[in-house]
From Swiss-Prot:
It comes from the Bacteria. It comes from Oleidesulfovibrio alaskensis (strain ATCC BAA-1058 / DSM 17464 / G20) (Desulfovibrio alaskensis). This is Tyrosine--tRNA ligase. Homodimer. Keywords: Aminoacyl-tRNA synthetase, ATP-binding, Cytoplasm, Ligase, Nucleotide-binding, Protein biosynthesis, RNA-binding. One of its GO terms (cellular component) is cytosol. It is found in: Cytoplasm. ATP binds at K228. Signal peptide: none annotated. A motif ('KMSKS' region) lies at residues 225-229.
Length: 397
């Protein structure tokens, strides 16, 4: 593949790239680039929003470059302050390592494990002593740190900034020195940290890494970023039917962004789909089904994805209730109030999310809308439907 084609693939769906001329010089050397992306395992599972970065790593992998999936087990215990209005509570080593194992299993649904270098930044950071940290801290000034947007806002609002939070971008930057990275990838909220890596590499006599940022993926609502706490996410490990159904709820406009950022479709294939929809040759719903099946197949295989599509059409196009809905039992009383059984069964992410959905009229029992979140259900068996795509067989004892 010639350089122009490589650049087109590399820049696909990117938000910003620093610096394109430097990248051309690196590519001209004809050796595989060392491409790094770091992930702090602060939660036990990944959702599709995280995979924007992983898909970009895959693009580099397909071009023959060395991909480094860096697990920030050391930085995870500090807590990334990026985009935070308050100090993030640090995790224990045990929590971080447990989450890291889950991450590895999930990312290899996208990346080729044979072509991926998995590293932990504790490999070099655990060897750092007090003198090493003081030397590292001397490489950056407080004034430069306060140029970072989230730090500046907190400083001007007289909100607490802990010293350890200043260390986070320095440690992340030093990771690039330790790995001799040619390129580092990150979300747009990581730009400051990525540039610190360039600065530290220059000071260590290394060729500064290029920086590529990817956009933050909007959640199912199309407004806010995908987040488990907001309930607008699709988890990588969700059952095929749930994943397919959630993806069918995105808007027609957001569908194309998902195609570009979190599928393996080529830009030419996506452009052809857009042309067919615009000409009326292909219905937008069919294009969305193709998207949902493609993404579901990435994580569950083509057979399960096809079954999910077939099941979706049986339930929603024909108004059927699925035969294989999950079953959940609870006791009469507090446990049988709608927010409780929705959250405890996993149908809703939390009791707060359940209450919001009930107020929006999203809950029905045996086909009847239910808008009272406070009254416990009496003993019996119910078919629960939450929104368009979530079903539950509820047994109250």
């Amino acid at each position: 593949m010639d350089m122009d084609q490589q650049l087109k693939t590399i820049l696909r769906g990117s938000a910003e790239f620093i610096d394109e001329e430097e990248l051309k010089k690196k590519l001209a050397k004809g050796r595989p680039l060392r491409v790094k992306a770091g992930f702090d395992p602060t939660a036990p599972d990944l959702h599709l929003g995280h995979t924007v970065l992983i898909h970009k790593l895959r693009h580099f992998q397909e071009l023959g470059h060395t991909v480094i999936f860096l697990i920030g087990d050391f930085t995870g215990m500090i807590g990334d302050p990026s985009g935070r209005s308050e100090t993030r509570p640090p995790l224990t080593r045990e929590q971080v390592l447990q989450n890291a194992e889950t991450y590895k299993k999930q990312v290899f649904k996208i990346l080729d494990p044979e072509k991926t270098e998995v590293r932990f930044n504790s490999e070099w950071m655990d060897k750092f002593g007090a003198a090493d940290f003081i030397r590292l801290a001397s490489r950056y000034t407080v004034a430069r740190m306060l140029e970072r947007d989230d730090f500046e806002k907190r400083y001007r609002s007289n909100m607490t900034i802990s010293i350890h939070e200043f260390l986070y971008p320095l440690v992340q930057g030093y990771d690039s020195v330790a790995l001799e990275a040619d390129v580092e990838l990150g979300g747009t909220d990581q730009k400051f940290n990525l540039l610190v890596g360039r600065h530290l590499q220059s000071q260590e006599g290394q060729e500064p890494q290029c920086v590529l940022t990817v956009p933050i993926l909007e959640g199912l609502d199309g407004v806010k970023k995908m987040s488990k706490s907001l309930g607008n996410y699709v988890g990588i490990d969700e059952p095929p039917a749930d994943m397919f159904g959630k993806l069918m709820s995105v808007s027609d406009e957001l569908m194309w962004r998902y195609y570009e950022l979190i599928t393996t479709k080529t830009l030419d294939e996506i452009a052809e789909l857009q042309r067919r929809v615009a000409s009326g040759e292909l219905h937008p719903k069919t294009a969305k089904e193709e998207l949902a099946e493609h993404i579901t197949a990435q994580y569950h295989g083509s057979d399960k994805a096809a079954e999910a599509r077939q099941g979706f059409n049986a339930v929603f196009a024909q108004g059927c209730v699925p035969d294989d809905m999950p079953e959940f039992s609870c006791s009469c009383g507090e446990d049988s109030t709608p927010p409780a059984f929705l959250a405890d069964s996993g149908l809703a992410g939390s009791r707060g999310e359940a209450k919001r959905l009930i107020k929006q009229g999203a809950l029905s029992l045996d086909g009847e809308k239910l808008d009272d979140p406070n009254t416990p259900l009496t003993a019996g068996e119910y078919v629960v439907r939450l929104g368009k795509k979530r079903f539950l067989r509820l047994i109250v004892r």
